[in-house]
């Protein structure tokens, strides 16, 4: 089951419907309040995911934490070589500029359907939470991250539909395709390849990365989260090697 992705899709569609109905965005004060609440919740669920992945005696917990740190270190090196964060930044910047351009345009200026669709697709799919949440959902059914992403995407869609119309809501299709594929692939790997210890290390690593996303949302620390995404693959690999 792709529970998290279904919740995420519902959030996008609900936000779009509300945006088209109300024809206005939330006030800056309400946006900031929701942003702060989401940041706190993401901190909680991220650290909770890491905490529940740890278990056993002091030596075993130390070993598990060491594996997570090693995975993050190696993962970041791989991510930088693959230029994951730079690519995500470039895509996000392009999408943001497109939205800003049409938001500031005269009322008679209407964007093409594909411009709204592509802009929202990039913003929803290039977010680190898309990969992290979908992977967590597939590895052990932990869909809380995608539920929080559903709120974020829903609020964004409320704003996007006022500029792009219903084409912004159509971005739900690639979101479901991408996140659903990641979740199903993670489910297959978890069921056929990973041991409980390997699953725990991947889940713990994902939890810390989700915590890093909260630091970005709360404007506390600029962390290149996308560069760390390969750590999700390195964590179970290091666990397997360190028997």
Model-based region annotation:
Residues 7-15, 19, 23, 39-40, ...:
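Alpha-helical transmembrane segments in multi-pass membrane proteins
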Residues 28-29, 83-116:
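Intrinsically disordered, low-complexity non-transmembrane regions of multi-pass membrane transporters
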Residues 23-26, 30-90:
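Membrane helix-loop-helix hairpins that form the core translocation module of multi-pass transporters
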Residues 1-14, 63-70, 138-151, 193-207:
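Structural signature of hydrophobic alpha-helical transmembrane segments
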Residues 215-233:
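Interfacial loop-to-transmembrane junctions
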Residues 18-32, 50-58, 159-205, 209, ...:
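Transmembrane-helix boundary and interhelical-loop signature of multi-pass inner-membrane proteins
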Residues 109-190:
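Helix-loop-helix junctions within the multi-pass membrane cores of secondary transporters/permeases
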Residues 191, 236-243:
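Juxtamembrane boundary at the C-terminal end of a transmembrane helix
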């Amino acid at each position: 089951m792709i529970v998290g992705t279904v919740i995420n899709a519902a959030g996008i569609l609900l936000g779009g419907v509300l945006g088209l109905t109300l024809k206005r965005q939330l006030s800056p004060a309400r946006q900031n309040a929701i942003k702060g609440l989401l940041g706190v919740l993401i901190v909680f669920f991220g650290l909770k995911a890491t905490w529940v992945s740890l278990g056993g005696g002091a030596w075993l917990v130390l070993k598990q934490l060491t594996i997570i740190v090693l995975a993050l270190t190696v993962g970041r090196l791989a991510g930088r070589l693959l230029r994951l964060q730079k690519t995500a930044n470039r895509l996000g910047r392009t999408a943001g500029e497109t939205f800003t351009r049409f938001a500031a345009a005269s009322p008679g200026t209407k964007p093409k359907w594909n411009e709204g669709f592509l802009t929202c697709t990039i913003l929803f799919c290039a977010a680190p939470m898309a990969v992290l949440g979908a992977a967590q959902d597939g590895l052990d059914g932990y869909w809380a991250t995608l539920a929080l992403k559903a709120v974020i995407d829903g609020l964004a869609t409320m704003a996007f539909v006022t500029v792009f119309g219903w084409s912004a809501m159509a971005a739900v299709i690639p979101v479901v395709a991408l996140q659903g594929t990641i979740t199903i692939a993670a489910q297959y790997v978890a069921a056929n390849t990973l041991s409980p210890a390997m699953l725990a290390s991947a889940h713990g690593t994902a939890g810390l990365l989700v915590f890093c996303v909260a630091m970005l949302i709360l404007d506390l620390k600029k962390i290149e989260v996308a560069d760390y995404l390969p750590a999700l693959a390195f964590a179970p690999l290091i666990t397997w090697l360190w028997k």
